[in-house]
UniProtKB/Swiss-Prot annotation:
Changing F352L: In DIH5; uncertain significance. One of its GO terms (cellular component) is neuromuscular junction. The gene is PLS3. This is Plastin-3. Changing W499C: In DIH5; likely pathogenic; the orthologous mutation in mice results in death within the first 2 days after birth; the animals display several phenotypes at late gestation and neonatal time points, including diaphragm abnormalities and anterior body-wall defects. It is found in: Cytoplasm. Changing G229R: Found in a patient with X-linked osteogenesis imperfecta; uncertain significance. Changing K364E: In DIH5; uncertain significance. The modification Phosphoserine is found at S268, S293, S326, S339. GO terms for molecular function: actin filament binding; calcium ion binding; structural constituent of presynaptic actin cytoskeleton. Changing N446S: Found in a patient with childhood-onset primary osteoporosis; uncertain significance.
Length: 630
């Protein structure tokens, strides 16, 4: 780091800045580029017109990017805070960083005291999450030692320390992710707790949480901003699980005139929720809302939404619930919000927001409140008579979901909700290249917002660049794949590129551990067999297509060879196996691999069905874990 930037900066201040930098650097590539700045201002929810934000970002890039490489390095970031501190632009930048949820309280850097530097975190979020978790786990005997937590104290940060609550919440969001048999519930020594936290973090990663900056020690120490950040991701995945057309065909009722099902399927869960709320508001004769922050502060839209979705008692066995609208005319915003929440309580949906959260327009908690309303009372009817091609509504395949979760766990931006539609401008693919150490020249990349006219041309240019990078520096096999295919969302060809990205990522991890020695399938298979035989195990594998892998016994034995004694063989079935036996073995194997510290993205079914690509990633991750034993 250059001298000038560090002269008057203490170690604590530097740590604060590093943390702030990491929050803005969404793809964790060590640089901030302009689309990450756009995201920051979007999330900070600042009352600035779009043109003003664009001006600020241009100015920041102009002043901050001193070596003119189109991105801001950490040194340049420090320089902005040190040298440009007094300017209005830098003040706005600092305010945006402070407003982004879960970010440390950045003062004016040099004014920060080196002692007692405090990370700020959102009390509102803590309160909301504690109440949600208390309700979700109230009957779980394994959580009696910590549930119910007091939302007004720091109970939450202590409660997550042994990993059990986190594992349980992951399973509530994506059922069956973690095999309960792999969670340590008794005799919680520090080593056993470490294993639970490994299991929670690697499983969170496997369902698509971005956990790159979080370690088991952070959770054991209950670092508030990291705990809240992880919990929000886990809770949100659960809340959004059914806000997806293939899992909820009634959402087709939200189609607008002239809109195709394909277009509706491209919307993110957030966009679908907004569309859903507006569908009901329109039916009630109330004006539309554009967000779940400023537009809901007066609770009036919420009153109408509750009134529309409350059961009318017309279906058999459905009790009628009447919403009392008298609070609508209350003059005080807080009292009106309280009155609205009392009505939500009648529906069993008083969750996530307090009256103050509604009135302040907290975007995260209001989004959660609305998602929960949708999940309990969608109040939509699947359209019958329309000319709709329902065959489009096939859900994503397991492989597609695994790829998507892998990308999201690396913190790509924007978040990938739909594998093909969200890769059509190649921005995510270009970020993945950076993750596999293929340099990207961001000055060649077109970034959103794209112009109304010619938007697709801009996206296609990105796709062409992505294919070019794949052929040359990355040396992928991309025969017959062009930028147009990515831009069209061609499934087979997009998958071919994405698989090569994931494979390279997996092999890179091994090469880093093996001092740069090239890794390939044969090397992994040989290592697996050598490790098994040295540990006195009788299993072995011929290749990643070996049908014996479907019993998962080779995987289980390998885990036990890497960490002797960790497998409870009473839980493992051998001999003549039924499909159920195989599935139970695979489920245990995947969870145990994650528990000993392997970041496995594959699913138990991949082992049972011996899917060679995913099988390769399982053994490669275990080899990586095995090589760390030095």
């Amino acid at each position: 780091m250059d001298e000038m930037a560090t002269t008057q900066i203490s170690k604590d201040e530097l740590d604060e800045l590093k943390e702030a930098f990491a929050k803005v650097d969404l793809n964790s590539n060590g640089f901030i580029c302009d689309y990450e700045l756009h995201e920051l201002f979007k999330e900070a929810n600042m009352p600035l017109p779009g043109y003003k934000v664009r001006e600020i970002i241009q100015k920041l890039m102009l002043d901050g990017d001193r070596n003119k490489d189109g991105k801001i390095s950490f040194d340049e970031f420090v320089y902005i805070f040190q040298e440009v501190k007094s300017s209005d632009i830098a003040k706005t930048f600092r305010k945006a960083i402070n407003r982004k949820e879960g970010i440390c309280a950045l003062g004016g850097t040099s004014e920060l005291s080196s002692e007692g530097t405090q990370h700020s975190y959102s009390e509102e979020e803590k309160y909301a999450f504690v109440n949600w978790i208390n309700k979700a786990l109230e009957n779980d005997p394994d959580c009696r030692h910590v549930i119910p937590m007091n939302p007004n104290t720091d109970d939450l940060f202590k409660a997550v320390g042994d990993g059990i609550v986190l594992c349980k919440m992951i399973n509530l969001s994506v059922p069956d992710t973690i095999d309960e048999r792999a969670i340590n519930k008794k005799k919680l020594t520090p080593f056993i707790i470490q294993e639970n936290l490994n299991l929670a973090l690697n499983s969170a990663s496997a369902i698509g949480c971005h956990v790159v900056n979080i370690g088991a020690e952070d959770l054991r120490a209950g670092k508030p901003h990291l705990v809240l950040g992880l919990l929000w991701q886990i809770i949100k995945i659960g809340l959004f699980a059914d806000i997806e057309l293939s899992r909820n065909e009634a959402l087709a009722a939200l189609l607008r005139d002239g809109e195709t099902l394909e277009e509706l399927m491209k919307l993110s869960p957030e966009e679908l929720l907004l569309r859903w709320a507006n569908f009901h508001l329109e039916n009630s004769g109330w004006q539309k809302i554009n967000n779940f922050s400023a537009d809901i502060k007066d609770s009036k839209a919420y009153f109408h939404l509750l009134n529309q979705i409350a059961p009318k008692g017309q279906k058999e066995g459905e009790p009628r619930i009447d919403i009392n609208m008298s609070g609508f005319n209350e003059t005080d915003d807080l009292k009106r919000a309280e009155s609205m929440l009392q009505q939500a309580d009648k529906l069993g949906c008083r969750q996530f927001v307090t009256p103050a959260d509604v009135v302040s327009g907290n975007p995260k908690l209001n989004l959660a409140f609305v998602a929960n309303l949708f999940n309990k009372y969608p109040a939509l009817t699947k359209p019958e008579n329309q000319d709709i091609d329902w065959t489009l509504l096939e859900g994503e395949t397991r492989e597609e979901r695994t790829f998507r979760n892998w990308m999201n766990s690396l913190g790509v931006n924007p978040h990938v909700n739909h594998l093909y539609a969200d890769l059509q401008d190649a921005l995510v693919i270009l970020q993945l290249y950076e993750r596999i150490k293929v340099p990207v020249d961001w000055s060649k990349v077109n970034k959103p917002p794209y112009p109304k006219l010619g938007a697709n041309m801009k996206k296609l240019e990105n796709c062409n660049y992505a294919v070019e990078l794949g052929k040359h520096p990355a040396k992928f096999s991309l025969v017959g794949i062009g930028g147009q295919d990515l831009n069209d969302g061609n499934q087979t060809l997009t998958l071919a590129l994405v698989w090569q990205l994931m494979r390279r990522y997996t092999l890179n991890v091994l090469e880093d551990l093996g001092d740069g020695q090239k890794a390939n399938d044969d090397i992994i298979v040989n290592w697996v067999n050598r490790t098994l035989s040295e540990a006195g195990k009788s299993t072995s594998i011929q290749s990643f297509k070996d049908k014996t892998i479907s019993s998962s016994l080779a995987v289980v034995d390998l885990i036990d060879a890497i960490q002797p004694g960790c497998i409870n063989y009473d839980l493992v079935k051998s001999g003549n196996l039924t499909e159920d036996d195989k599935h139970n073995n695979a489920k245990y194997a995947v969870s145990m691999a994650r528990r000993i510290g392997a970041r496995v993205y594959a699913l138990p079914e991949d082992l049972v069905e011996v899917k060679p690509k995913m099988v390769m990633t399982v053994f490669a991750c275990l080899m990586g874990r095995g090589m760390k034993r030095v």
